[in-house]
Amino acid sequence: MLSKRIVTALNTAVKVQNAGIATTARGMAGASGSEVSKILEERILGTETGINLEETGKVLSIGDGIARVYGLKNIQAEEMVEFDSGIKGMAMNLDVDNVGVVVFGNDKVIREGDIVKRTGAIVDVPVGDGLLGRVVDALGNPIDGKGPIANARRSRVEVKAPGIIPRLSVREPMVTGVKAVDSLVPIGRGQRELIIGDRQTGKTAIAIDTIINQKRFNDAGDDKKKLFCIYVAVGQKRSTVAQIVKRLTDAGAMDYTIVVSATASDAAPLQFLAPYSGCAMGEHFRDNGKHALIIFDDLSKQAVAYRQMSLLLRRPPGREAYPGDVFYLHSRLLERAAKMNNSLGGGSLTALPVIETQAGDVSAYIPTNVISITDGQIFLETELFYKGVRPAINVGLSVSRVGSAAQTKAMKQVAGSMKLELAQYREVAAFAQFGSDLDASTQQLLNRGVRLTELLKQGQYVPMGIEEQVGVIYAGVKGYLDKVDPSAITKFEKEFLAHLRSSQQALLKTIREEGQISPQTDAQLKDVVVNFLATFKP
């Protein structure tokens, strides 16, 4: 009799369990694999955890920096999530049955079954004056060992670029201190100028010189001329970034500079995010009526990181295996550089993106994309670099589409004819090597071209003021150096600049403040050059 009762009780228990399993199976139809078996096991054991699937989820799989998460039903696109281990991630793929999350850090500490929580916030970073002089990672966390960042508020990394009405056309010069750039491909505040070339051709050198050159304006105390700088290092070696920070510190340029670093050893999502984080920091200055310069070094590596993420998220590949929206990746970033109108404070954000080409091929996918987005490009050539022409700027292929409107009148007056003369020189030089008997005008063109090319050479980390550039270029363009041996041009420039700085400060001040060469200044400059050449010994 007792055994009969036990059997009846067991049968009842099995029926209850079966009913529970059927309910669970219907409720969890969206889950798969180990997740389903885990939930069923918990239900059978009567230890249901009661997780809220709207606000939390569980890791189904983890690998290659991508986590597939079950749950998180209410999550937004690009929302930050937090894993059990404290590592942050960003929701990129919102699929029917799971969420694809890119992990901002080491995915080795994340396990299957870990809880993932929504933060309710889109990815944001600290912005403000407190970041000046600091080195931060792609999420704005300090990595320079100088303690937490003070005096900063938080801002989203992805914001919409300013529309047409809030903008003004580019009108103020952004002086780089590099003669070849300021005279031939001038850049204005609010412009996007691409620096493009093969590896080891001096792309970063131009960018760093530009940052160092802003010291003269920032030290002058005029808020309208101050330019704050953001240097974004993407996919570079840590040793290279440390070297750049040391160089900027030695030059006293870190006082007005922020360095955002996502090095080669950082996760691909951080390399993808770093340019947007840097841009948000630059927009703080732009939107508060100040001026900022941002350097993306380089966007080729950001595109590679984005390709890696997209392929791992199973997004369909396109040309060169890049995803279909790789153009939008860069356009939405670079469109945020702008010159704002006066009612919005008149601030500006200037962008100098860097692109690395392979064997000088500017017709590849990413280079052509960025060329079409920017307002001009500075093209650096390996061949010129090895010939000793440094900066190795190909004047024929380099162009600034809007910068001439911002160029100072003094520079326009002296450098106006130089681009044409150099273009004619290159054309004639190609034919001159085939024949020796040249007419006088062709010989004159060759002589002038050789000397102007020598004159545009410049050492690294020695940017020049615009008034000094005007003085040197004036001597070359007006023909005063035609009789000076090309090998002595560098010596002439060095001694002539020393002469101007020591005994012609009033003349330099006039050029700097008036911004143009009046007939009186022209006569004065002529006298200075002629008198100096009379005593110059090559």
Swiss-Prot record:
Membrane topology: Peripheral membrane protein
Tissue: Ubiquitous (at protein level).
GO molecular function, one term: ADP binding
Transit peptide found in the keyword field: yes
Top-level lineage group: Eukaryota
Loss of function: phenotype: RNAi-mediated knockdown of the protein leads to impaired growth and development. In addition, it impairs the assimilation of enterobactin-bound iron.
One GO biological process term: iron import into cell
Binding site for ATP: G197, D198, R199, Q200, T201, G202, K203, T204
Subcellular localization: Mitochondrion; Mitochondrion inner membrane
GO terms for cellular component: mitochondrial inner membrane; mitochondrion; proton-transporting ATP synthase complex
UniProt keywords, alphabetically: ATP synthesis, ATP-binding, CF(1), Hydrogen ion transport, Ion transport, Membrane, Mitochondrion, Mitochondrion inner membrane, Nucleotide-binding, Phosphoprotein, Transit peptide, Transport
Site residues, Required for activity: S398
Chain positions covered by the region annotation Essential and sufficient for enterobactin binding: 228-248
Oligomer status and interactors: Subunit of the F-type ATPase which has 2 components, CF(1) - the catalytic core - and CF(0) - the membrane proton channel.
Additional notes on this entry: The siderophore enterobactin (Ent) produced by enteric bacteria binds Fe(3+) and helps them scavenge iron ions from the environment. Enterobactin produced by non-pathogenic E.coli strains facilitates iron assimilation in C.elegans. Other siderophores, such as ferrichrome and pyoverdine that is produced by pathogenic bacteria, do not facilitate intestinal iron absorption in C.elegans.
Family to which the UniProt record says this protein belongs: Belongs to the ATPase alpha/beta chains family.
NCBIfam families membership: atpA (TIGR00962), PRK13343.1 (NF009884)
HAMAP family hit by this protein: ATP_synth_alpha_bact
Function: Mitochondrial membrane ATP synthase (F(1)F(0) ATP synthase or Complex V) produces ATP from ADP in the presence of a proton gradient across the membrane which is generated by electron transport complexes of the respiratory chain. F-type ATPases consist of two structural domains, F(1) - containing the extramembraneous catalytic core, and F(0) - containing the membrane proton channel, linked together by a central stalk and a peripheral stalk. During catalysis, ATP synthesis in the catalytic domain of F(1) is coupled via a rotary mechanism of the central stalk subunits to proton translocation.
UniProt protein name: ATP synthase subunit alpha, mitochondrial
Organism name: Caenorhabditis elegans
Name of the gene this protein is made from: atp-1
